[in-house]
């Protein structure tokens, strides 16, 4: 396996260091190439993602990312110039966000309900394509638009991926949208779900408006198995999912090209946390969980299961104990 490693900014290098220790323990011999992308490169060269580096990334099997973001950076420069550019250039049309409440982790929801679902979010369309603009900026007559782009091709491949995952899980899929108001895009999504559902007769299909889904994710999260949704709604509900599962510090994600044409990228959802960077107190659990997603994507199923099991056992016994970054890595390594 050829792995590109982007440690990034803030606590990124610290959490990725522990994630790589776990990766090496379960799959020895992974060929790694480290790339210094983020605020340091920008301040040094004025570049965010050089074309030559992007070409090199394409030659790897997968990418592991730490965190991107620094208060010294202009807003949006790294997000659009690095993260979104990688997503679009490498066709990461699937954003995969598991939502699982592990034993031993405290949910803000009463009774610590059983939660185990996955959100399949469309990653390259919607209002994130940059299709829009503004006129008469700064005047009382300013007009700003953000156009949400939904293509039959783009929607279908995400829906197909979601059905495949539902078939392998508890055989239940929920489309989350707002088709009573967003009638054009909503109709395309619902018709696509109905068409693909015919190929998966064992999978039960449900629909929820996005506002209703946010309520049910809090009041009855156990009803969800696989959620499929568009880019914007997915961006919102996945953070809510992380919150009910114990916090964004335990949230892993995958940005996936399901065709395997390009390397997929895996990362913890948390930010770069510059306020605690370098102190050795950042929790690397989400980065290690991202390694499990990476291994599963690369068909290293046994290794992925070992990492997931080790994380689960660590969380089940950790309690409120304050551990350093390295101590968390040591504990999880000890559970392998």
Swiss-Prot record:
Domain of life: Bacteria
Annotated pathway: Amino-acid biosynthesis; L-leucine biosynthesis; L-leucine from 3-methyl-2-oxobutanoate: step 3/4
Keywords attached to this entry: Amino-acid biosynthesis, Branched-chain amino acid biosynthesis, Cytoplasm, Leucine biosynthesis, Magnesium, Manganese, Metal-binding, NAD, Oxidoreductase
GO cellular component, one term: cytoplasm
Reactions the enzyme catalyzes: (2R,3S)-3-isopropylmalate + NAD(+) = 4-methyl-2-oxopentanoate + CO2 + NADH
Location within or outside the cell: Cytoplasm
Cofactor(s) listed in the protein's UniProt record: Mg(2+); Mn(2+)
SUPFAM superfamilies on file: Isocitrate/Isopropylmalate dehydrogenase-like
Chain residues that bind NAD(+): 271-283
Residues the record lists as binding substrate: 87, 97, 121, 211
Amino-acid positions noted as binding Mg(2+) in the UniProt annotation, renumbered to this chain: 211, 235, 239
First-tier enzyme category under EC: oxidoreductase
Pfam families: Iso_dh
Keyword Nucleus: no
GO BP term, pick one: L-leucine biosynthetic process
EC number per UniProt: 1.1.1.85
Gene Ontology MF terms in the entry: 3-isopropylmalate dehydrogenase activity; magnesium ion binding; NAD binding
Annotated cofactor note: Binds 1 Mg(2+) or Mn(2+) ion per subunit.
Residues of the site described as Important for catalysis: 128, 178
Subunit organization: Homodimer.
Similarity comment: Belongs to the isocitrate and isopropylmalate dehydrogenases family. LeuB type 2 subfamily.
Record function comment: Catalyzes the oxidation of 3-carboxy-2-hydroxy-4-methylpentanoate (3-isopropylmalate) to 3-carboxy-4-methyl-2-oxopentanoate. The product decarboxylates to 4-methyl-2 oxopentanoate.
Stated name of the protein: 3-isopropylmalate dehydrogenase
